[in-house]
């Protein structure tokens, strides 16, 4: 459970007709803009690192991306694409008056950070990637290879549930549990 501490600054930023909630910790001149994992996770699971880095003299800025945490949660599938997320980050940057900053992307936030840095390189002082992947086509190939090892019947079942939008079905979830145990966390 993350440590609870009130942010030094909390803002609501308009994005695409909705609002996202931003959090700032610390007041140093060295800014660390953190993009967390997900998509769909609020940034609070990284609260302890926010606090630690603020205590080390950084101003740490994070936000609940659209669709999660305390930000608005629109039910609009057209919003969920990487280009729009990149523009969301840029909108937040401008709204908070951030010039050059250090960008840290964790997990999904790493993918987003790479795209943001390629689109807005002049805003970036440094880029740190944590627990992420830099080559999505390779990742997709490897994930499919791992899934194929479950056998043709299981793969057919998974593809069926994915096409039907029923990935919450118990047999699909059982297959995901096996994949996660074999390839993500073996505890």
Located regions from the model:
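N-terminal cap/lid segment of alpha/beta-hydrolase-fold proteins
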Residues: 2-19
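Active-site acidic short loop of glycosyltransferases
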Residues: 15, 27-29, 94-100, 122
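Conserved HGGG/HGGXW glycine-rich cap/lid loop of the alpha/beta-hydrolase fold
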Residues: 18-74, 78, 93
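Catalytic nucleophile-loop/oxyanion-hole region of alpha/beta-hydrolase
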Residues: 74-86, 133
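Conserved acidic catalytic loop of the alpha/beta-hydrolase fold
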Residues: 83-101
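Conserved hydrolase catalytic core segment
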Residues: 99-142
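Flexible "cap/lid" loop of the alpha/beta hydrolase fold
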Residues: 126-166
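Alpha/beta-hydrolase
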Residues: 159-187
